[in-house]
């Protein structure tokens, strides 16, 4: 039996450069990845370098709220 809340939670990572450069509107969308993280090991917000198909390069993807 599990105690309290689940340790692993599903999170969404969103491209930070697409969000900032939304004014230019060169891209047709915002890159998002769905992954899981362990709350005990990483209590803070997660940031990973992932490939953004709209920017055509590797950028920092930050965790967003659901």
UniProtKB/Swiss-Prot annotation:
Share an example GO biological-process annotation for this protein. Answer: translation
**Which InterPro entries does the entry mention?**
Ribosomal_bL33, Ribosomal_bL33_CS, Ribosomal_bL33_sf, Ribosomal_zn-bd
Q: What is its main location?
A: plastid
Q: What is this protein called?
A: Large ribosomal subunit protein bL33c
Q: Which UniProt keywords apply?
A: Chloroplast, Plastid, Ribonucleoprotein, Ribosomal protein
Question: Which NCBIfam families did the record assign?
Answer: PRK00504.1, PRK00595.1, rpmG_bact
Q: Where in the cell is it found?
A: Plastid, Chloroplast
For this chain, the family text in UniProt reads: Belongs to the bacterial ribosomal protein bL33 family.
Q: What is the lineage of its organism?
A: Eukaryota, Viridiplantae, Streptophyta, Embryophyta, Tracheophyta
Q: Which GO terms describe its molecular function?
A: structural constituent of ribosome
What gene does the UniProt entry assign to this protein? rpl33
GO CC list? chloroplast; ribonucleoprotein complex; ribosome
> Organism source for this protein?
Olimarabidopsis pumila
